[in-house]
């Protein structure tokens, strides 16, 4: 499914007329205002239940604990957005059931009015998550902003129960100073390692490009951990598991995407630093001269010796 951005600001699935498309430069983030959430996302969702947005997931807040929500989200590092259907505490009442297995969401403060121009279009409620059961629950740093339609956008042909049923929830975790905390979360549950590697196995990594491996890396990941993991995969492919060889096989090196190596210098530098340390250690233990050991290793690995010189300039630019 293709994702398009219309001039109205919606990031939606499906086709958009060419005249309506806009291009966003790299670095743009999904950070809508309260009014934009109401106008461009919640209202279309209430009118059409099939409406979806690339940046907003769908979740049942009564079945998911707040610390598990980042894994359910589509995008986000500091805050996560969801379409939610509010569960009624009583079938004939209007009170919302805000309990989960581990605790409950409790409203705090006064609801904030949201205006489009001079017209009231929605309301924002702030809630805090408590572990345990009321009234002895323990307050946590998980906060939720819940957006609902109101005023101008409270559609006349829907009952009060129906129009309030669908809301947008923005969830985030705060520090002790009240600022939003950046959270680097791992792969979602059941995807703790690459399905690509599990299905093919380490022995079949040779001939695989690093670009291919990267296609399975989640956006919610720690960069340092990713670098170390990629180095491990890189070394396994080039040297083989448990190998003591000091120089890479040129054929294996050429299997990797040089643009990736050029643009991800930290991975290559970690690999080279590690190999240099190992080289010196083995050189010291063997008592061989550096020139003898280098020449011997090179001859044992150079399977492309008859093809002439190989240009690896793009690999070493870091």
From Swiss-Prot:
Residues 121-180 bind DNA. It is found in: Nucleus. The keyword Ribosomal protein does not apply. One of its GO terms (molecular function) is DNA-binding transcription factor activity. Disruption phenotype: Delayed senescence accompanied by a small delay in flowering time. InterPro entries: NAC-dom (IPR003441), NAC_dom_sf (IPR036093). Residues 24-174 form the NAC domain. Mostly expressed in root cortex, phloem, atrichoblast and quiescent center (QC), and, to a lower extent, in root endodermis, xylem, pericycle, columella and lateral root cap (LRC). Expressed in roots, cotyledons, very young leaves, senescing leaves, mature flowers and pollen. The keyword DNA-binding applies. Keywords: Activator, DNA-binding, Nucleus, Transcription, Transcription regulation. Induction: Rapidly and strongly induced by H(2)O(2) treatment in both leaves and roots. Accumulates during senescence and in response to wounding. GO terms for biological process: leaf senescence; positive regulation of DNA-binding transcription factor activity; positive regulation of leaf senescence; response to hydrogen peroxide; response to wounding. GO terms for cellular component: nucleus. The NAC domain includes a DNA binding domain and a dimerization domain. PANTHER family: NAC DOMAIN-CONTAINING PROTEIN 59, PROTEIN CUP-SHAPED COTYLEDON 2-RELATED. Transcription activator that binds to DNA in promoters of target genes on a specific bipartite motif 5'-[AG]CGT[AG](4-5n)[AG][CT]ACGCAA-3'. Triggers the expression of senescence-associated genes during age-, salt- and dark-induced senescence through a regulatory network that may involve cross-talk with salt- and H(2)O(2)-dependent signaling pathways. This is NAC domain-containing protein 59. It comes from Arabidopsis thaliana (Mouse-ear cress).
